[in-house]
């Protein structure tokens, strides 16, 4: 399954219940990560914040099983009853938070570029290939 920028991913193994917004290119999904796909793509901000809510994270942690490594079953999770607000509320929420959602993606991309620059520059500074004035 191909991952597109803005897709919401959910960890199913290890640190179960951790969600993030995908960014970048050429990402693929494996069996221990779930892709959360709302029927309406405009609802991505709501889905992201819902799965980051402390009550939802707690629910997912309580559903996880396994002694050596915790595993969250998507089947078990999908059977849980969760209170969902009205469609009009979700639309209002998303229209007010879409810019924040986009900013998260942008900042993640910028952080990635800064990490790449650090990884290039730090060895050069340590080897004195370049100097800071």
Predicted feature residues:
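A short beta-sheet element
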Residues: 1-52, 56, 66-68, 73-75
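Amphipathic alpha-helical coiled-coil/heptad-repeat segments
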Residues: 41-42, 46-49, 57-67, 75-133
């Amino acid at each position: 399954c191909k991952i597109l920028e803005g897709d919401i991913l959910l960890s199913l193994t290890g640190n179960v219940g951790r969600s993030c917004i995908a960014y970048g290119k050429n990402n693929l999904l494996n069996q221990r990560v779930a892709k959360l796909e709302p029927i309406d793509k405009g609802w991505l901000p709501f889905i992201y914040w819902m799965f980051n809510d402390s009550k939802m994270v707690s629910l997912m942690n309580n559903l996880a099983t396994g002694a050596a490594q915790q595993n969250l079953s998507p089947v078990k999770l999908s059977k849980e009853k969760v209170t969902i607000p009205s469609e009009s509320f979700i639309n209002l929420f998303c229209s007010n938070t879409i810019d924040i959602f986009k900013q998260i993606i942008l900042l993640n991309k910028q952080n990635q570029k800064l990490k790449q620059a650090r990884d290039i520059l730090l060895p050069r500074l340590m080897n004195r290939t370049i100097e800071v004035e």
